[in-house]
From Swiss-Prot:
Protein name: Cytochrome c-550-like protein
InterPro entries: Cyt_c-like_dom, Cyt_c-like_dom_sf, Cytochrom_C550
GO CC annotation terms, alphabetical: photosystem II; plasma membrane-derived thylakoid membrane
Gene designation: psbV2
Naturally occurring in which organism (per UniProt): Synechococcus sp. (strain JA-3-3Ab) (Cyanobacteria bacterium Yellowstone A-Prime)
Xref: Gene3D superfamilies: Cytochrome c-like domain
Subcellular locations according to the entry: Cellular thylakoid membrane
Length: 174
């Protein structure tokens, strides 16, 4: 009929709407997936940590909670800053002093709490506490802030508690 326009035909590609729905679902699942995907396998398996755990904060018995993600961050920091001298919790420059829980407790002052490990990392002292330790470099806040250093300390302490062979100086199965 004259004067009337017919609506333009719209072409639809079959399944196009479903494709977009599928893509959006995948994106949503990626963003909403549990944090377990960000947990290092070493942390979940050897540190036996898939849920938040409590570690000793200070010698008075106060505890601090750490998530598996924080322990993963601590592990990554350990690998980038400490691994050259502390493979598997051993201490290559001083093999008789490891990062085992026994050796951490035996230091003066003891280094078996998060607070003590952070203090040590800021100002390394000899095992008996009498002099500056030149074997371990100080970690200034400009390098690692307090939260990062607590995560590193938490990784070391948790590994000393439960990781098989940690601090045993049995590198390479020897």
């Amino acid at each position: 009929m004259p004067g009337q326009t017919q609506g333009a035909k719209r072409w639809r590609v079959p399944g196009r709407g479903w494709r977009w729905a599928g893509i959006l679902l995948l994106v949503w699942l990626g963003l909403a997936s549990p944090a377990a995907g960000r947990i290092d396998p070493y942390v979940s398996h050897y540190l036996r940590t898939t849920e938040p755990i409590e570690l000793p904060w200070d010698a008075e018995g106060h505890m601090l909670t750490f998530t598996p993600e924080q322990l993963t961050d601590g592990k990554n920091r350990f690998q980038s800053a400490c691994l050259n001298c502390h493979v598997g919790g051993s201490t290559l420059p001083a093999p008789n002093i490891s990062l085992s829980l026994k050796d951490l407790r035996g230091a003066t002052p003891p280094r078996d709490t998060i607070q003590a490990l952070v203090e040590y990392q800021r100002d390394p002292r000899s095992y008996d506490g009498t002099e500056v330790s030149y074997g371990c470099r100080p970690v200034p806040p400009s390098w690692m802030d307090d939260e990062a250093l607590r995560n590193l300390a938490a990784f070391i302490l948790r590994a000393a508690q439960v990781a098989p062979g940690w601090g045993s100086n049995a590198i390479g199965g020897g």
